[in-house]
A protein has these predicted regions:
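A sensor for short, sequence-defined functional sites
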Residues: 1-181
Length: 181
């Protein structure tokens, strides 16, 4: 595991080497070394989308999240995990949340949970409209570039991935799918 915190990348570091310590530059890693990935795998059940959510974290995003969990203590950690699997409006039902891998020595942190997303389904005139986008993104707030006095800095360089898949039931057909954003 070769994680290097972003805040020291590109800095000089002294490496012990007996009587002659070495000064070297800490290498900068690519932005994709830090990943925040949330995926949903749904199927239609009654009037709701039901399925599994899978959250993966690597690099600075993993370190940030693990610090957040550690600061919260054991009492609130399950609630934090469930909130991170939920949509921004927290209107989905999240159950059976559990860690798959939270070992700090491993590259990825991973937790999963069961999801019931009833607000994603709207039915009218025998047709079903499905909203797959949970709008779950930590850093998607609008940046006002007209009123700012300083440069805008994101907290860390990272790739944020949000993916949702839906298994279409037998006998159903897709009538319209909006273009990709």
């Amino acid at each position: 595991y070769t994680y290097t915190p972003q805040h020291i990348q590109g800095s000089e570091a002294m490496i012990e080497n007996g009587d002659k310590p070495l000064m070297q530059i800490v290498p900068q890693q690519k932005a994709d070394s830090s990943i925040d990935s949330l995926s949903y795998a749904y199927h239609l059940q009654g009037d709701a989308l039901v399925g599994k959510a899978n959250y993966l974290l690597r690099g600075d995003m993993k370190e940030w999240f693990m610090s957040l969990i550690d600061d919260a203590g054991n009492k609130n950690s399950e609630e934090i995990l469930a909130n991170n699997l939920n949509s921004d409006t927290h209107n989905m039902t999240v159950n059976n949340v559990k860690w798959i891998d939270k070992d700090a020595r491993n590259v990825w942190a991973n937790f999963v949970g069961d999801i019931v997303n009833q607000p994603a389904i709207q039915q009218a005139d025998g047709e079903i409209y499905v909203e797959l986008n949970p709008h779950n993104n930590l850093f998607d707030n609008r940046i006002d570039t007209t009123g700012r006095a300083n440069d805008y800095y994101f907290p860390v360089r990272c790739n944020i991935v949000r993916q949702a898949s839906l298994t279409i039931p037998a006998g159903y057909k897709v009538d319209y799918m909006p273009p990709s954003a």
